[in-house]
């Protein structure tokens, strides 16, 4: 696969919206079709590459800047990069798009807050509501819905397989690895 054929699928949405589930399902389908693909999961990266960062506005900006640069490096090698990151602010997503350049696809994985809370197996929303987690996106921290995402996935209404099909079709329409 040529370097010009890589892409970065930047999945944004609240915690519990289904970003990681969708990212892993898309990754599996891409790999089965013989495409080079990688998932950059925000939670995983925060435990490793970005373990030195907290959740202050400055640290969130740096976290997403690093992820965008890593994503761009993989894309330049022809990978389809699936970044599953909350990226709560419009400016963060604009910055990521600028860093990545051509091949950036913003995907809004949307689900109502009550659905995200119901899916929360770790109890993070409950802890945030008790004030135990400051700056928690959607509770004590803002989430700015994307203004013009390339793709919107309503994860509470659309099955994962159908969502993957929609993303693969979008990739194919862009001339990127897909079907």
Swiss-Prot record:
One of its GO terms (molecular function) is adenylylsulfate kinase activity. Signal peptide: none annotated. The active site is at 87 (phosphoserine intermediate). It comes from the Bacteria. Keywords: ATP-binding, Kinase, Nucleotide-binding, Phosphoprotein, Transferase. Pfam families: APS_kinase. ATP binds at residues 13-20. Its EC number is 2.7.1.25. Gene3D superfamilies: P-loop containing nucleotide triphosphate hydrolases (3.40.50.300). GO terms for cellular component: cytoplasm. GO terms for biological process: hydrogen sulfide biosynthetic process; sulfate assimilation via adenylyl sulfate reduction; sulfate assimilation, phosphoadenylyl sulfate reduction by phosphoadenylyl-sulfate reductase (thioredoxin). It catalyses: adenosine 5'-phosphosulfate + ATP = 3'-phosphoadenylyl sulfate + ADP + H(+). Pathway: Sulfur metabolism; hydrogen sulfide biosynthesis; sulfite from sulfate: step 2/3. Belongs to the APS kinase family. Catalyzes the synthesis of activated sulfate. This is Adenylyl-sulfate kinase.
């Amino acid at each position: 696969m040529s370097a010009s054929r890589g892409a970065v699928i930047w999945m944004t949405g609240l915690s519990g919206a289904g970003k990681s589930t969708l990212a892993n399902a898309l990754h599996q389908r891409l790999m089965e079709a013989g495409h080079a693909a990688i998932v950059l999961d925000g939670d995983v990266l925060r435990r490793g590459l970005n373990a030195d960062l907290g959740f202050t506005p400055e640290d969130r900006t740096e976290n997403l800047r690093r992820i965008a640069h890593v994503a761009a490096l993989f894309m330049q090698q022809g990978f389809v990069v699936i970044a599953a990151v909350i990226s709560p602010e419009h400016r963060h997503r604009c910055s990521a798009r600028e860093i990545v350049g051509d091949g950036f696809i913003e995907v809004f994985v949307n689900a109502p807050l009550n659905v995200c809370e119901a899916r929360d197996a770790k109890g993070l929303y409950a802890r945030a509501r008790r004030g135990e987690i400051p700056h928690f996106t959607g509770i004590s921290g803002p989430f700015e819905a994307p203004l013009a995402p390339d793709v919107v996935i309503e994860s509470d209404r659309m099955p994962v397989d159908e969502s993957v099909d929609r993303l693969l079709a979008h990739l194919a329409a862009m001339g990127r690895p897909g079907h």
